[in-house]
């Protein structure tokens, strides 16, 4: 049986701020920004080249929901990715080489954390 990860919900305290961070800072594509009713708002964004998306919004999680930690984005060139994100205003840690696999870390405005990962060549 095949399974594919489709959607990762991320808690946020400010949907517009998070949407700006992911769309303008990280370069994610805004797939949907809808208000289906009952005070809900759903914003789905997808990293370039990914088939898995994130979703942020209003009425989707408790305000005090735990933050998501250490989501990985695999990139071909971590130095280039780090440079592009830094130029877009995203604070990214220095690159660490962990035995051929390289990592750099960042967090969104709500404290959800991410790792850029370049696999060993």
Model-identified regions with their sequence ranges:
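Short, charged/polar surface micro-motifs in flexible loops or helix N-caps
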Residues: 48-52, 62-64, 77-80
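Short, charged/polar, Gly/Pro-enriched secondary-structure boundary elements
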Residues: 50-54, 111-114
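Vicinal oxygen chelate
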Residues: 3, 7, 31-34, 41-42, ...
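Generic preference for hydrophobic
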Residues: 45, 56-58, 116
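Core segments of cupin and vicinal oxygen chelate
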Residues: 2-3, 9-52, 87
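Short amphipathic alpha-helices within nucleic acid-binding modules
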Residues: 21, 79-84
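Eukaryotic phosphotyrosine signaling hubs
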Residues: 5-7, 68-71
């Amino acid at each position: 049986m095949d399974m594919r990860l489709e959607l990762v919900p991320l808690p946020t305290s400010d949907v517009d701020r998070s949407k700006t961070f992911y769309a303008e800072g990280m370069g994610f594509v805004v797939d949907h920004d809808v208000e289906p009713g009952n005070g809900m708002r759903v914003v789905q964004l997808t990293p370039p080249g990914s088939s898995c998306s994130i979703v942020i919004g209003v009425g989707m999680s408790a305000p005090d929901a735990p933050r998501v930690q250490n989501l990985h984005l695999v990139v071909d060139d971590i130095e280039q990715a780090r440079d592009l994100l830094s130029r877009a205003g995203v604070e990214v840690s220095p690159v660490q080489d962990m035995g051929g696999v390289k990592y750099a870390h960042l967090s969104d405005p709500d404290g959800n954390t991410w790792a850029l990962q370049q696999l060993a060549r």
